[in-house]
Amino acid sequence: MAIHPSSYDPETSTTHYTFLPGQPDSGHRKSIKVVSVILLSSFFLLYLAAFVILNNQPPNLQNKSPSASETLTPATPSRGVSQGVSEKTFKDVSGTSQVSYTWSNAMLNWQRTAYHFQPQKNWMNDPNGPLYHKGWYHLFYQYNPDSAIWGNITWGHAVSTDLIHWLYLPFAMVPDQWYDINGVWTGSATILPDGLIMMLYTGDTDDYVQVQNLAYPANLSDPLLLDWVKYQGNPVLVPPPGIGVKDFRDPTTAWTGPQNGQWLLTIGSKVGKTGIALVYETSNFKLLDGVLHAVPGTGMWECVDFYPVSTLDANGLDTSYNGPGIKHVLKASLDDNKQDHYVIGTYDPVKNKFSPDNPDLDCGIGLRLDYGRYYASKTFYDPKKQRRVLWGWIGETDSESADLQKGWASVQSIPRTVLFDKKTGTHLLQWPVAEIESLRSGDPKVKEVNLQPGSIELLHVDSAAQFDIEASFEVDRVTLEGIIEADVGYNCSTSGGAASRGILGPFGVVVIADQTLSELTPVYFYISRGADGRAEAHFCADQTRSSEAPGVAKQVYGSSVPVLDGEKHRMRLLVDHSIVESFAQGGRTVITSRIYPTKAVNGAARLFVFNNATGAIVTASLKIWSLESADIRSFPLQKL
């Protein structure tokens, strides 16, 4: 018999990680109610540093040359591209060789997250086929059981009762048939009206041709869905004429068509440089005429997602729902630039066509789900709480040798709810699922700070490496009304980061910083003047000084974000050691940062609030919660 969800108690469970050599396995990462005691002398040094910074000097946010023990290593080989999927290794810009850093085991162990989902060891990428079944949330994921690099892709499987605490299960599917022998790649789940679960996934054949295959649970009454059967008639779809054999992958969840009993699904592809979404009718797997949508110049579309959102209320919708008060979201992961783009529009099921509300914001040329390290996202409808939930892959941006040393690579984002932004009419709102708040430890620390131009203040928290912060910022109205003097054409990625000062920015928080601010990751707002002369807000995450190690990504992520009349500038950050997920204005703009500090680790991480503007006084209001660790461990199958 399968264990019922109610018999799993996270309060009495233990997390098991795979620790590096020389590091004792201490079991569950300790609760973060009180991580360490700061000595009086340390407090004195911190206050002294803060005083020096505040003494008529702007924050120490300038870029400096790193000093580190460096070695040259061979260039990282390409992985995945030759088989027809996106590049799976982070490519340093240094050419034929790259600079690597000598990481200690303590540093690498610190990088492992405490409440984001990741396997015990080895490589992980795309989230696959998320669903809810008989009391359990199921997450499948691309996994290499042999190594911390991409290859031998298998479907990992885990279950949860709350999307936060997870139990690893045996592999759902392995590459063991001619039609998937080179990889059981990304797929989606469709739940039929009678409760039958159909999983459609891409297989890489023995001839490296991308085909679509069906699988289904061997025992639908099993809440854990432990055993899966591959359909004997696989493959059910092969690349159609005019489509490359390596340009046909990642089927979506199916939805009901206009004809009785008809089911439709879409698959990403390209024709030349035009990204397209093909549509198939599933009763006989017939390719329908035309395409659901196409956008020239966007290249190969991977991991396409297509679903409805309500313009009237805050509930999520089943993928097949259509009617009044409905918009549809088309999302594609762009192989050319490794970005997840989306567009909101109207779906005509009779003509099988999607039309964007604003062609200037079309898929691939407009809005992104996340402006940081975030790719291959996948949503599902959660019938338990009537919401649409979004998963995304957070990949590595360090060296492959470092991943091999630590023995794992990549995590999944915290699941997010997705809603239509009724105020703008153009954006989605993404927000961490409410269950993450169950990890909050006690009452929040509440702080209100009046920040003069060029000031920074240390915030004393129990842990500056594992927390949830909500912050709002109010710019003095007199200065804000002088927007005519602000700069025009600001761009996060080309701005110079938090060290670049203007009349109205930057201002925000500094996370995962050491006490001297030699390593820091600022997340901030910057107000500029738009082409129409009105104030335009930007939301940015600056990684340029996030690490003194060479060979890791150091750039500024971000985009503009609508801040409407009467709204304060608001942000929420989930900080989990080497991951920072940042949400602006209720989730209109989101940035995921993957960082690799060398100093701000093992209790040395600090949290600051700052205002590096030259002319604006900013009032910051903050609530900060320390977060407990999630329980992520193997399912006790011996109890079945």
Curated annotation (Swiss-Prot):
Gene Ontology cellular component terms for the protein in this record: membrane; vacuolar lumen
Biological processes, Gene Ontology terms: sucrose metabolic process
Q: Which residues cross the membrane?
A: 34-54
- So which domain of life are we looking at? Eukaryota
Q: Reaction catalysed by this chain?
A: Hydrolysis of terminal non-reducing beta-D-fructofuranoside residues in beta-D-fructofuranosides
**Gene Ontology molecular function:** beta-fructofuranosidase activity
**Subunit arrangement?**
May be present in two forms, a 70 kDa monomer and a heterodimer of the 30 kDa and 38 kDa subunits. The ratio of the levels of the two forms within cells appears to be regulated developmentally.
What is the protein name for this chain?
Acid beta-fructofuranosidase AIV-18
Organism, by scientific name, is: Capsicum annuum (Capsicum pepper)
The organism that produces this protein has a lineage beginning with: Eukaryota, Viridiplantae, Streptophyta, Embryophyta, Tracheophyta
